[in-house]
Curated annotation (Swiss-Prot):
<feature type="modified residue" description="Phosphotyrosine; by SRC">
    <location>
        <position position="756"/>
    </location>
</feature>
<feature type="domain" description="Cadherin 4">
    <location>
        <begin position="489"/>
        <end position="595"/>
    </location>
</feature>
<dbReference type="GO" id="GO:0022409">
    <property type="term" value="P:positive regulation of cell-cell adhesion"/>
</dbReference>
<feature type="modified residue" description="Phosphoserine">
    <location>
        <position position="848"/>
    </location>
</feature>
<dbReference type="GO" id="GO:0045177">
    <property type="term" value="C:apical part of cell"/>
</dbReference>
<dbReference type="GO" id="GO:0010468">
    <property type="term" value="P:regulation of gene expression"/>
</dbReference>
<dbReference type="GO" id="GO:0046697">
    <property type="term" value="P:decidualization"/>
</dbReference>
<feature type="signal peptide">
    <location>
        <begin position="1"/>
        <end position="23"/>
    </location>
</feature>
<keyword id="KW-0812">Transmembrane</keyword>
<feature type="glycosylation site" description="O-linked (Man...) threonine">
    <location>
        <position position="472"/>
    </location>
</feature>
<dbReference type="Pfam" id="PF01049">
    <property type="entry name" value="CADH_Y-type_LIR"/>
</dbReference>
<dbReference type="GO" id="GO:0005794">
    <property type="term" value="C:Golgi apparatus"/>
</dbReference>
<dbReference type="Pfam" id="PF00028">
    <property type="entry name" value="Cadherin"/>
</dbReference>
<feature type="compositionally biased region" description="Basic and acidic residues">
    <location>
        <begin position="776"/>
        <end position="786"/>
    </location>
</feature>
<keyword id="KW-0325">Glycoprotein</keyword>
<feature type="glycosylation site" description="O-linked (Man...) serine">
    <location>
        <position position="287"/>
    </location>
</feature>
<feature type="compositionally biased region" description="Acidic residues">
    <location>
        <begin position="757"/>
        <end position="769"/>
    </location>
</feature>
Amino acid sequence: MGARCRSFSALLLLLQVSSWLCQELEPESCSPGFSSEVYTFPVPERHLERGHVLGRVRFEGCTGRPRTAFFSEDSRFKVATDGTITVKRHLKLHKLETSFLVRARDSSHRELSTKVTLKSMGHHHHRHHHRDPASESNPELLMFPSVYPGLRRQKRDWVIPPISCPENEKGEFPKNLVQIKSNRDKETKVFYSITGQGADKPPVGVFIIERETGWLKVTQPLDREAIAKYILYSHAVSSNGEAVEDPMEIVITVTDQNDNRPEFTQEVFEGSVAEGAVPGTSVMKVSATDADDDVNTYNAAIAYTIVSQDPELPHKNMFTVNRDTGVISVLTSGLDRESYPTYTLVVQAADLQGEGLSTTAKAVITVKDINDNAPVFNPSTYQGQVPENEVNARIATLKVTDDDAPNTPAWKAVYTVVNDPDQQFVVVTDPTTNDGILKTAKGLDFEAKQQYILHVRVENEEPFEGSLVPSTATVTVDVVDVNEAPIFMPAERRVEVPEDFGVGQEITSYTAREPDTFMDQKITYRIWRDTANWLEINPETGAIFTRAEMDREDAEHVKNSTYVALIIATDDGSPIATGTGTLLLVLLDVNDNAPIPEPRNMQFCQRNPQPHIITILDPDLPPNTSPFTAELTHGASVNWTIEYNDAAQESLILQPRKDLEIGEYKIHLKLADNQNKDQVTTLDVHVCDCEGTVNNCMKAGIVAAGLQVPAILGILGGILALLILILLLLLFLRRRTVVKEPLLPPDDDTRDNVYYYDEEGGGEEDQDFDLSQLHRGLDARPEVTRNDVAPTLMSVPQYRPRPANPDEIGNFIDENLKAADSDPTAPPYDSLLVFDYEGSGSEAASLSSLNSSESDQDQDYDYLNEWGNRFKKLADMYGGGEDD
């Protein structure tokens, strides 16, 4: 056991020597401290006996004294004055690594520390590593693993502990780190080389190895913040270039030096805290970072402190900062925004737990306002006036003062009218001045109340802090009387009347009342809007009458069976005021519209025609609409059929009964509604030269709904024959024109008691008819009168109009022939005419007894004087009279 301990002590000594080689100091300067920030000591077993030497730490105090007072933070270990670390009692390591701090004091009584790490290596490691306890963690000699004959070597069984080298070393370079040896160097000449980062890979040349001796060296100072660990591979080859060993991995760990100051994440930190905050209230957090090692050293262990506070009122230390977290909180009470709205702190961050390098930053703390000041009215009494009926009228401006921060919830005023149960007033806050603007929320009525005394209370958007009392103001409001417009009662009147309401009848009486009870005013009425001109109003009484027939189906003026008219009432006040009322006439439906088909124009193909759907429309309302009844009239059913398309009988299906000729057809369709209101509508139907559905209709001439081609040819032939007959009669009359003498004598030749007897009937029999009768057709004839004889009253024959149904054309011709035969005025005149009848005997007896004026015999004509005044002239001519 003693030999084993001596061997392990020798190994530790070799490790310590290697560490000294890497920790050379400049001779011209002395900096107190440990030679390394971290010491790593391997232990062969986890069970350590009392007095077991682990290793030795080196401390340079710059005083020349070889011994220094050390102490361990772990009570299980003891550090001698020369830096040797031993186990104080039997110890079992439960972890592969155990770390603790060793502290020492320099000549200025400043405490310094280093970290010691114990690594449990196991038996197989001890077998291949020969370390001196004085050589720290870096062995002086590294041996390639041996391969025993007959055994398969496991590469992972050979573990090389990391080699530590401090960063930022000073002195001459290159410096030896460790020597690498091969067991084959006794058999053959061995040459050594290294590869990896820092050797043949960037950064190239940081580490080199002597080709023959195997010494691994560092060529320049290292920077842990740039590269914290290097992984190299050592190679051993013979003189002919053959590998005598497998490559061995070497890990070089760069130990940290406190060469980086902490850096704040911001130059200026901003935070806020409410005024009046109690001690302990968190305000904000500052943070800093350090690029040094924060795992194995305290070089990045940052501690925060407050260096200064501005202003230092009301206390010097109003805030404190947590050393570890950087959280700034309130230390003492007394924060008042109105006195000190902001504080500026200078915060320091130092590594080595506050003992190392440091830096500073600013922390600006804003004291937030709280509602600790109530708004106050200034002044507290106001007076204003407002005209009645005005809404949103400005009455008065209420002034307040508030010491809280402007434009914050603790400053913004909220006004309330205390004694306003009907909510007739409202106070609006001016966002700029914070003043209260008192307005009317509803129209005031002078006749109801002439003056209001209001109490207005002011508060803030944010609730008061503490026991603050709201301020109150008194406002006196006088209502000014104005002439008010008449008011219709109700403002909208609804009246139901049938649409056939009689013209000139009174519909209703729509009147308004005068709200100004203190004034004696007269109201007149007139219609302001009557788009259909259906109404008129009595200007004195407001009675409304109809002036024209109303129509519910007038879509331009009637919406939803309602006709809207506006009535205005005007008083005679100063100024004149006018009120408006709305009259809603609900027109009750009357069955005044017969149903109509839609569409009325259709096209069918001649071959295999497709049926058409006809929709029945009726603008009336139920029950004056469906179900409808339909019927084809005027013989249309010969060629066409209709049937109902739905159970409600609101649409029809029209289709030809048989194949029809190409052309246009007139179909008479009779439709009747549920109340038997009917109407016959003519449908224009085109039969096209196509099959199935009509795409491009080829039309022919117009064809009657029931006529066939032979019937049409017969009618055309009859018309042609009639035209030829009329032409022949006109030619004949032009050759036999006779000028008739007037039947009565001229006015200047009128003589009493003189008759003309030379008119013998109607002249020649072949000319005794009116030529104008030849131009008459079978329709109604014009009336013929004479001015020489009294007219003879006789019945006018009734001619039947041409039927639309071609099947009735035969009856039409027969009946009209009979009517023509019984018409005495129709040619030819086949009755017996008497030409020698000269009328009955005259009351004046025959004139044949009178002698001619040429007779020589004297005649007595005195009796002519007895015949009266009409024969006086004749008596004077033949009687002689007194002139004789």
